[in-house]
Amino acid sequence: MAVRASFENNCEVGCFAKLTNTYCLVAIGGSENFYSVFEGELSDTIPVVHASIAGCRIIGRMCVGNRHGLLVPNNTTDQELQHIRNSLPDSVQIRRVEERLSALGNVTTCNDYVALVHPDLDRETEEILADVLKVEVFRQTVADQVLVGSYCVFSNQGGLVHPKTSIEDQDELSSLLQVPLVAGTVNRGSEVIAAGMVVNDWCAFCGLDTTSTELSVVESVFKLNEAKPSTIATSMRDSLIDSLT
């Protein structure tokens, strides 16, 4: 299921929300309408939490997370950290990271198994990422852009990358991530895909300007039509991966 939304008439929903398979963070403020769109789709399965990070509402660009954990920048206040800790499931680890490239959502992107990071990210941050989020980390660019977190979005089912990504790059990224990739846009031609949408294994939220063609591409590449919110599928995949490794 792919749904359109906007935050105070702003279609960059990926800036104001962070969605994973175990929780969803939504920026404080804004209209209640934005929050209720997420709550309407997700509240039966995962917690939807109002939050700010380092006093900012652009939480989607400030943090990186998956079902195992959440990394936030070092300037996140104790109060914000405590609120997020209290609101998320106990199984989710939350860690503050001291990183020069502090907009973590712009310089890293991940699903539950693999992460792509900015080529200049600190080694220490890379280790924390691998440890807390339980992912394999690759230093990569997307269409020669170092901000991999801005120009690429992927779940455990599929991924959408910058429209100018070459076929060779798509194939390389696809083999690293082990999911099918499609080059495309959101919000009527926006190349900054991660700012315009958020996605997990069964649901996507795109900006209000997203065309029906873009929406159908999102639904097909992320396999949202056949998807059900299910921890069973996740645990089955985990056991399969364990048996293969």
From Swiss-Prot:
Keywords: Cytoplasm, Initiation factor, Nucleus, Phosphoprotein, Protein biosynthesis, Ribosome biogenesis, Ubl conjugation. GO terms for molecular function: ribosomal large subunit binding; ribosome binding; translation initiation factor activity. GO terms for biological process: assembly of large subunit precursor of preribosome; cytosolic ribosome assembly; maturation of 5.8S rRNA; maturation of LSU-rRNA; miRNA-mediated gene silencing by inhibition of translation; miRNA-mediated post-transcriptional gene silencing; positive regulation of translation; regulation of fatty acid biosynthetic process. It holds the Pfam family eIF-6. It is found in: Cytoplasm; Nucleus, Nucleolus. Its main location: cytoplasm. The modification Phosphoserine is found at S166, S174, S175, S235, S239, S243. Phosphorylation at Ser-174 and Ser-175 by CSNK1D/CK1 promotes nuclear export. Belongs to the eIF-6 family. Monomer. Associates with the 60S ribosomal subunit. Interacts with RACK1. Interacts with DICER1, AGO2, TARBP2, MOV10 and RPL7A; they form a large RNA-induced silencing complex (RISC). Binds to the 60S ribosomal subunit and prevents its association with the 40S ribosomal subunit to form the 80S initiation complex in the cytoplasm. Behaves as a stimulatory translation initiation factor downstream insulin/growth factors. Is also involved in ribosome biogenesis. Associates with pre-60S subunits in the nucleus and is involved in its nuclear export. Cytoplasmic release of TIF6 from 60S subunits and nuclear relocalization is promoted by a RACK1 (RACK1)-dependent protein kinase C activity. PANTHER family: TRANSLATION INITIATION FACTOR 6. This is Eukaryotic translation initiation factor 6. The lineage of its organism: Eukaryota, Metazoa, Chordata, Craniata, Vertebrata.
